């Protein structure tokens, strides 16, 4: 009897230990058709198969090699590498000059222009520092870093604008950031990559593009229903149902974005790194970092703080610039501000495309659009809810229709062949020009 109890508990604990084995294999063990040695061998094959570990092993080896080559620069050397090595940084003094003009004169137009020029080199350096940091983190996390540090500016501007009751500025700026990323940033990255590789169709992971397109379409769906509810006048409680629906959808979108991050970083790591590792094999000479990991983090913090400061001043100058330049506020919010706010993604995506790393370019441009639409927009709705501001997902009919058509066009291009050619490069840029022209002649009746 004791021997039977021992065998029963022994088999029980073995089943817990090997719970990852399929149920039919556990049944064969209990029936004596497979012994323990064979089962352990099958378990090792299941968990250590080449398909699941090849990409992670390649990336780990590449990361170890880069970390071993990490430079140790002094403060002066780091300053020379990051600040003095780029001719575009000659525009850096325009930032302090813009602040000086802001306090000494009332010319909002000049202040706005100087701020735009001053932010441009800072945003490019953000892309550079993020690329350096991605050398120590890997391709997937590197793409998320590019998107995150680029969108910090939009989040700061949005929260400040919400505090000031400028809900429409928040909506238009975030909308413009999405449009700029999926059309202008991606189109320019493809175009610059084509200039470096003129006779080559650059390849990207089509499976990744399909998932990204699905996320963008889900974001559009979340924005469509509050707009349709408003314009069909079918609310159960007029004035409150639209806001309640927006807050509910925002919570769902935040959960979906968290699941997307988990899927991208944990569940399917090889799914997203296979193509990037192939690109790294052909361009290892370009992968040696110029600054250390902590230098990159410090420079990222400095640049982000300075860009955010200038961006905050830009918000206050929007109305004055609209009057001075005689252009609609919607054009400034949807076109001009996002171009500067997305300069980090713009520079990063172009740099990656010029190194034939189109998956990283897509990770920056499309990843940033997903982060804005699935995180920044619903996050602002929730923050506005906490502040008592009636921020909703109703972007109005013209703006929502523009976003819907744009996402459909981009999703169609990304799912065609998994390649970039001159036709796609040209079409994306021309589509953005159409959008820009539309907002130049569009007067927003809800501004204010």
From Swiss-Prot:
Residues 103-109, 163-178, 231-243, 317-334, 385-393, 447-448 are extracellular. Keywords: Antiport, Calcium, Calcium transport, Ion transport, Membrane, Transmembrane, Transmembrane helix, Transport, Vacuole. Residues 150-185, 341-376 are annotated as: Cation selection. GO terms for molecular function: calcium:proton antiporter activity. It is a multi-pass membrane protein. Residues 31-81, 131-141, 200-209, 265-295, 356-363, 415-425 are cytoplasmic. It comes from the Eukaryota. It is found in: Vacuole membrane. Belongs to the Ca(2+):cation antiporter (CaCA) (TC 2.A.19) family. Cation/proton exchanger (CAX) subfamily. This is Putative vacuolar cation/proton exchanger 6. It comes from Arabidopsis thaliana. The gene is CAX6.
């Amino acid at each position: 009897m004791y021997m039977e109890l021992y065998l029963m508990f022994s088999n029980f604990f073995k089943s817990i230990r090997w719970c990852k084995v399929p149920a039919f294999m556990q049944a064969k063990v209990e029936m004596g058709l497979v012994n323990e040695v064979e089962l352990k061998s099958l378990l090792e094959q299941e968990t250590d198969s080449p398909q699941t570990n090849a990409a992670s092993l390649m990336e780990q080896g590449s990361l170890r090699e880069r970390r071993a080559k990490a430079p140790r620069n002094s403060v002066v050397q780091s300053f020379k590498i990051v600040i003095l090595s780029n001719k575009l940084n000659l525009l850096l003094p325009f930032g302090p000059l813009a602040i000086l003009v802001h306090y000494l004169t009332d010319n909002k137009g000049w202040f706005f222009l100087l701020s735009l020029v001053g932010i441009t080199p800072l945003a490019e350096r953000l892309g550079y520092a993020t690329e350096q940091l991605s050398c120590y983190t890997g391709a997937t996390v590197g793409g998320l870093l590019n998107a995150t540090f680029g969108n910090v500016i939009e989040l700061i501007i949005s929260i400040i604008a919400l505090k000031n009751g400028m809900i429409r500025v928040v909506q238009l700026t975030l909308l413009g950031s999405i449009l700029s990323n999926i059309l202008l940033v991606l189109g320019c990255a493809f175009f610059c990559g084509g200039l470096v590789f003129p006779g080559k169709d650059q390849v990207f992971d089509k499976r990744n593009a399909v998932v990204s397109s699905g996320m963008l379409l889900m974001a559009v769906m979340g924005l469509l229903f509050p707009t349709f509810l408003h314009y069909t006048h079918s609310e159960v409680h007029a004035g409150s149902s639209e806001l309640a629906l927006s807050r509910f959808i925002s919570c769902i979108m935040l959960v979906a974005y968290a699941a997307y991050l988990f899927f991208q970083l944990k569940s399917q790591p090889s799914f997203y790194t296979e193509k990037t590792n192939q690109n790294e094999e052909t361009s290892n000479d370009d992968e040696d970092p110029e600054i250390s990991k902590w230098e990159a983090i410090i420079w990222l913090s400095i640049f982000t703080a300075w860009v955010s400061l200038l961006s905050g001043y830009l918000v206050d100058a929007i109305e004055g610039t609209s009057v001075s330049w005689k252009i609609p506020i919607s054009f400034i919010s949807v076109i001009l501000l996002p171009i500067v706010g997305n300069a980090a993604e713009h520079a990063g995506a172009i740099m990656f495309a010029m190194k034939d790393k189109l998956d990283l370019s897509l990770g920056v441009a499309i990843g940033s659009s997903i982060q804005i639409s699935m995180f920044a927009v619903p996050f602002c709705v929730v923050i506005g809810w906490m502040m008592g501001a009636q921020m909703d997902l109703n972007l109005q009919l013209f703006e929502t229709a523009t976003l819907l058509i744009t996402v459909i066009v981009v999703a169609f291009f990304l799912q065609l062949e998994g390649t970039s050619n001159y036709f796609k490069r040209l079409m994306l840029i021309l589509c953005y020009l159409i959008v820009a022209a539309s907002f130049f002649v569009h007067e927003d009746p809800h501004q204010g």
